[in-house]
Curated annotation (Swiss-Prot):
It comes from Homo sapiens. This is Protein C-ets-1. PANTHER family: ETS, ETS TRANSLOCATION VARIANT 2. It is found in: Nucleus; Cytoplasm. Residues 304-312 are annotated as: Helix HI-1. Residues 130-243 are annotated as: Activation domain. The modification Phosphotyrosine is found at Y223.
Amino acid sequence: MKAAVDLKPTLTIIKTEKVDLELFPSPDMECADVPLLTPSSKEMMSQALKATFSGFTKEQQRLGIPKDPRQWTETHVRDWVMWAVNEFSLKGVDFQKFCMNGAALCALGKDCFLELAPDFVGDILWEHLEILQKEDVKPYQVNGVNPAYPESRYTSDYFISYGIEHAQCVPPSEFSEPSFITESYQTLHPISSEELLSLKYENDYPSVILRDPLQTDTLQNDYFAIKQEVVTPDNMCMGRTSRGKLGGQDSFESIESYDSCDRLTQSWSSQSSFNSLQRVPSYDSFDSEDYPAALPNHKPKGTFKDYVRDRADLNKDKPVIPAAALAGYTGSGPIQLWQFLLELLTDKSCQSFISWTGDGWEFKLSDPDEVARRWGKRKNKPKMNYEKLSRGLRYYYDKNIIHKTAGKRYVYRFVCDLQSLLGYTPEELHAMLDVKPDADE
């Protein structure tokens, strides 16, 4: 990346290449005559960007755009993108891709956010969005006489406000590193079915989810930094709302409605983060028509097994777990990769290229290219290949959703509590699909 920076706080972008050689090397990757960024040049670029971004403050004041991007409406998002396009003379920006509110935009995560715009354009916008989010951090005391969160109010195009009853926080001193939510720690806390169902809330009500990232590097005078954004596994607070009680019980009866916001905050940190099942972004193709302005009154209960039993429109001969039905059950909107894999794994006709190994929730991609081809067809991405598919699988590793089985090629395992969500044990599914344990076992 090259940058020409004046004495004024402006930035001219000449050329860039977005390359992730460490994780996804590709022999046919286009190369350009662009010198490598050194630590000093990166710092120069960062400072130039920050100086230029400061001009957005006047635009915020002029248009009444909230400081916290998670509180932006679709109009605010559009105004922000328009400002960036004019400020940096950006080309090739498709404004239609940014038709979402601020909460959905911030929830995308870097990889998927970058897909919204051309290479260097997306990098610039993401850098600015991160800066805006960090600037909105405010401290709240959590020790002593003020153990509860103050009542928090959130607004968006579709959603209403909710108060948080309290949050139980794990003392940071028990861990040696700032990013201490390690795989081993998460594994000690298997995710419950109630938390699986909170996917519904995370997707239907993105702007009202509370995140409390109590990182050790933010500790100052017994204060923690608390931000309002979608929960990620980086936090370590177990929140609960006034009526929904979090306990490790796998009871669906305790959930009053999929479409209420009684359980907006869950133990996403000390347990596997199932909002990760939706990818960061759980909002790819976030369309307002998929998220009704009024809360539905129906109150379905039970497992996915119960859900499909009452669906006469489902073909009983084709997969046991249709991805579309599972997406509807969890409220995820567009079909996600984990749902698609479950569909293939429960379809007898797909056993030649993907199947259960017979060992619990472990499965094998016998023909990974065919799996990738079908995923690309489902998502209308004809260039999909296994390298790209595996990128999504890798994302699930540190979220304790899916793990790669060591020493076995193309073998993975669901490590989350699928049984409580689906209502099937792995043995039941194996029997229904005539799965025989692998001879290699």
